[in-house]
Amino acid sequence: MADQLTDEQIAEFKEAFSLFDKDGDGCITTKELGTVMRSLGQNPTEAELQDMINEVDADGNGTIDFPELLNLMARKMKDTDSEEELKEAFRVFDKDQNGFISAAELRHVMTNLGEKLTDEEVDEMIREADVDGDGQINYEEFVKVMMAK
C-alpha cells in the first residue's frame, strides 16, 4: 500500500510523524496523538484516540510506528471522501471562519504543531499557495496545494 507514495510524500509524512512523536522514540502513543489533535482544535476522548491507534496498529503493540502511519496515509489518500477531509482541514486553519487562511492563522496552527517558523517561512508558504496574489489562501488555493502533494 505505502509503495504507492512518492518519496516527497514519504518525506512529508516523516516530518509530520516527528511532530506527533514528541519524545522521539519512534512510536506515537494515544497521549501524543491526543496532544496534537487538541492543538488542532479537536477534542477526542481516550476511547476515540485508542480506536484511531488500533485502526493502524498492525503489530498490536498499542502505538503507531512510521511504517504503520505510512499505510494509514496511503489508505486515506485512496479514499474518495477526501473532499470532506480537505474542508475540515481548511476549517482548522481558518480560525476566524472568513473563508481565507491568513499568515497569522497559518503561523498559529504551525506553532501549535510545534513548528517554529520565521515570518519569512510563513510568507513563503502563503506565496507558494496564493494563486490570486491577495496575500492569503482561499479554499480553492488550499485544495490545489493539498492535491499537489
Swiss-Prot record:
* Chain positions recorded as Ca(2+) 1 binding sites: D21, D23, D25, C27, E32
**Alphabetic keyword roster:** Acetylation, Calcium, Metal-binding, Methylation, Repeat
Q: Which residues carry this modification: N-acetylalanine?
A: A2
- Which residues are recorded as binding Ca(2+) 3? D94, D96, N98, E105
Molecular-function annotations in GO: calcium ion binding; enzyme regulator activity
Which of this chain's residues are annotated to bind Ca(2+) 2? D57, D59, N61, T63, E68
Q: Can you tell me which family this protein belongs to?
A: Belongs to the calmodulin family.
Q: Which InterPro entries match?
A: CALM/Myosin/TropC-like, EF-hand-dom_pair, EF_Hand_1_Ca_BS, EF_hand_dom
Which residues are reported to carry the modification N6,N6,N6-trimethyllysine?
A: K116
In what residue span(s) does the EF-hand domain sit? 8-43, 44-79, 81-116, 117-149
> Which organism's genome codes for this protein?
Zea mays (Maize)
User: What name goes with this protein?
Assistant: Calmodulin
Sites where the protein binds Ca(2+) 4: D130, D132, D134, Q136, E141
* GO cellular component entries: cytoplasm
- Annotated function: Calmodulin mediates the control of a large number of enzymes, ion channels and other proteins by Ca(2+). Among the enzymes to be stimulated by the calmodulin-Ca(2+) complex are a number of protein kinases and phosphatases.
An additional note in the Swiss-Prot or TrEMBL entry is: This protein has four functional calcium-binding sites.
